[in-house]
Amino acid sequence: MAVPKKRTSKSKKKTRKAVWTAKADKAAVEAFSRARSVLTGRSSSFYYAANNDISK
């Protein structure tokens, strides 16, 4: 017969959520930084076609 699991404490739940949120915030900041460097032309590690026209 199925037995319900024990409830997770509020502190553990908040800690896990805080870690997840911090990781997401860090990834967003890094992505924004990379995008900004590409758009300003200061990027030295990204290679991309500047004028990529799909209709050709």
UniProtKB/Swiss-Prot annotation:
Record's keyword terms, sorted: Chloroplast, Plastid, Ribonucleoprotein, Ribosomal protein
GO CC term (a single one): chloroplast
Principal cellular location given in the protein's record: plastid
Matches recorded under InterPro entries: Ribosomal_bL32 (IPR002677), Ribosomal_bL32_plant/cyanobact (IPR044958), Ribosomal_zn-bd (IPR011332)
Gene Ontology biological process terms from the UniProt entry: translation
Pfam families: Ribosomal_L32p (PF01783)
Localisation per UniProt entry: Plastid, Chloroplast
GO molecular function (one): structural constituent of ribosome
Family indicated by similarity: Belongs to the bacterial ribosomal protein bL32 family.
Protein name: Large ribosomal subunit protein bL32c
Organism in which the protein naturally occurs: Huperzia lucidula (Shining clubmoss)
Gene transcribed to yield this protein: rpl32
